[in-house]
Regions:
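Conserved glycine-rich cofactor-binding loop
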Residues: 19, 26-27
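Conserved glycine-rich Rossmann-like NAD(P)H-binding loop of the short-chain dehydrogenase/reductase
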Residues: 42-57
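Substrate-binding pocket helix/loop in short-chain dehydrogenase/reductase
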Residues: 110-111, 118-123, 213
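Active-site helix of classical SDR
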Residues: 134, 170, 178
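Residue(s) in the substrate-gating loop at a strand-loop-helix junction
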Residues: 154
Length: 255
């Protein structure tokens, strides 16, 4: 199946027919991930929070072009939501083979402005929910001898970023989770990786004037959600790549 505007529409044998759950499917990166995974032949659960229209529209678009997709609502601030989301996905599509944990909060606050409830919400969505989702899908992946887990992090995990300490801490936690899971699951055919994008259009990743930011980026422009999705497909389709956190920032933050 070829999705509109997809330069990376070649099917990945590793992903064709697999059930893939994407959280944050209403955002710019989530939408691009959905289109790329559909083009790779995956059957999709598109999870969304408060804003369901984009995820529902994307599901309809994928179905209209011959693919399989269902929108699923989940408030990932709730500790019960990840289990309910996995259950709903499995009821509609079957066991989850590919987990792309992309949902995230990014409320900008200074150290002085952050209440304990703000910190708790950030950790709940950005770190606890990815862990709980992975915890639910790993047993089935291990039993089937195949699994792909991809966490969408941020360069804020490396640099501290500009959103706030609660955001940076939550994203840094994802890197630790990635490394812990990857080492222990590799022998079961499960890969675990993370992407750390920055300065992507159509997202909340732009801490300032786009023109000023563009001038500071070595490649001379902002990134596109489709470029994040292209990298995600390459990572998910590679059985030898695991335990990696890959930056995608136009060369702005060398590591």
């Amino acid at each position: 199946m070829t999705m509109p505007g997809n330069r990376a529409a070649s099917n990945s044998p590793a992903l064709a027919g697999r059930v893939a759950l994407i959280t944050g499917a209403s955002g710019g990166i989530g939408q691009a991930l959905g289109r790329r995974l559909a083009a790779a032949g995956a059957r999709l659960a598109l999870a969304y929070g408060a804003n369901g229209a984009p995820a529902k529209d994307l599901a309809a678009e994928i179905i209209a072009t011959g693919g399989h997709a269902v929108p699923v609502q989940a408030d990932l601030r709730s500790a019960e939501a990840p289990a309910a989301l996995i259950e709903a996905t499995e009821d509609k599509l079957g066991p989850v083979d590919v987990l792309v944990s992309n949902a995230g909060l990014g409320r900008r606050q200074s150290v002085e402005e952050i209440a304990s409830s703000d910190f708790d919400d950030m950790i709940a969505v950005n770190l606890r929910s990815p862990f709980l989702l992975a915890q639910r899908v790993v047993p089935g992946m291990r039993e089937r001898g195949f699994g792909r887990i991809l966490f969408v992090s941020s360069v804020a995990a490396f640099t501290g970023g500009s959103v706030g300490p609660h955001y940076a801490a939550s994203k840094a936690g994802l890197h630790g989770l990635t490394h812990y899971l990857a080492v222990r699951l590799a022998s079961h055919g499960i890969t675990v990786n993370a992407l750390a994008p920055a300065l992507i259009t159509g997202t909340a990743m732009l801490p300032g004037d786009p023109e000023e930011l563009r001038a500071r980026i070595p490649v001379g422009r902002l990134g596109r959600p489709e470029e994040v999705a292209d990298l995600a497909i390459a990572v998910l389709g590679n059985a030898y790549l695991t335990n990696q956190v890959i930056g995608l920032d136009g060369g702005m933050y060398p590591r």
